[in-house]
Amino acid sequence: MSVTEIRQLVNWFRVHNEVQVRRNEATEKLTLEQVMALLYYVQGMHLAVFDTVAFADDILACERGVAIQTVATQFYATAGLIDDLDEAVIADHDAIEADPQLAAIVHTVQAFADGRSIIRLITRLSTERPWMETPQNQVILPGLMADYFRKLVQVIE
């Protein structure tokens, strides 16, 4: 299994959220903080299930959840993450869907996040061992994430 470009994962969540917003106007629009939290869960689940990272980018523990520098840099100036979805964004979404293992992970993470506000999502994340044991503004180690998420997956099974 190859490492996915993080942009493709972000775009999968962008397209998914845009569809949800069209179906229900009360749905919260995807935020930068939320997509980074979702990526944290994708990485953790991928490590737990496949023993490899889903993407190569570092995840930092921050006061308000997690940060992924490449995502923050690329999307910081974007007014709305679901505005202006072009064909390239749709193609990234479709590429994730074409990978059954990765698609299963993102769908599981999305199902977990559905109905949770960004505040609830970040509050949960900040009570989890990988975030709590990582000093602020430092990289959350993949090994720490793998150990934590493997235990979660065992509980679910």
Protein language model features and the residues they cover:
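Domain-edge interaction signal
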Residues: 1-157
